[in-house]
Regions:
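Chalcogenol-based redox active-site neighborhoods
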Residues: 3, 12, 18-169
């Protein structure tokens, strides 16, 4: 199941109050406009896509299933190991998973990650970007994260889109 359009209403005076409305299927594509969003980082600060892009740098937004699992750790460490090359250019790296802020903080500390992680426990941002989809394992279906990466240019357009990306590990 893929989601095309999500309206997210969040009251910042009540951080856990989120209402989302999902409609038809769609997958984001290169050349399209990246969906605008506001979300909380693991340190409790707010990340606003348009504000991040206003710095003149693009944003590499990557979605991964779970902190401290082999594939996700490999992916995060690959971004870490290439961070100087990426961030010295024109990009800011931001990871997203449905893990808690505490889990993210431990993950960042344990692997010395030099970039921010967004807390998306209810998968609203995942749904907005089409990365929260029906999956199956051993004959059972469930909703989960499809490992995906989006390179968002400073003008807000999608310069690169990768669904079902593979990790080195």
């Amino acid at each position: 199941m893929r989601y095309t359009h999500i309206l997210i209403e969040t009251r910042f005076d009540e951080p856990n109050s989120v209402v989302s409305h999902m409609t038809e299927d769609v997958t984001l594509a290169v050349g399209g406009i990246a969906p605008e969003f506001e979300a909380f980082l693991s340190d409790g600060s707010k990340f606003v896509l348009s504000e991040a892009l206003s710095s003149g740098k693009g944003v590499i937004l990557y979605f991964y299933p779970r902190d401290n699992t082999p594939g996700c750790t490999s992916q995060a460490c690959d971004f870490r190991d290439n961070f100087g090359r990426i961030s010295d250019g024109s990009w800011k790296v931001v990871g997203v998973s449905t893990d808690s802020a505490k889990s993210h903080q431990n993950f960042i500390s344990k692997h010395e990650l030099p970039f921010d992680l967004i807390v998306d426990e209810e998968a609203e941002l995942h749904s907005l970007y089409g990365t929260w989809r029906e999956k199956s394992m051993y004959g059972k279906t469930y909703m989960g994260t499809v490992r995906s990466t989006f390179a968002i240019s400073s003008d807000g357009t999608l310069a690169w889109v990768g669904y079902k990306v593979k990790t080195k590990g």
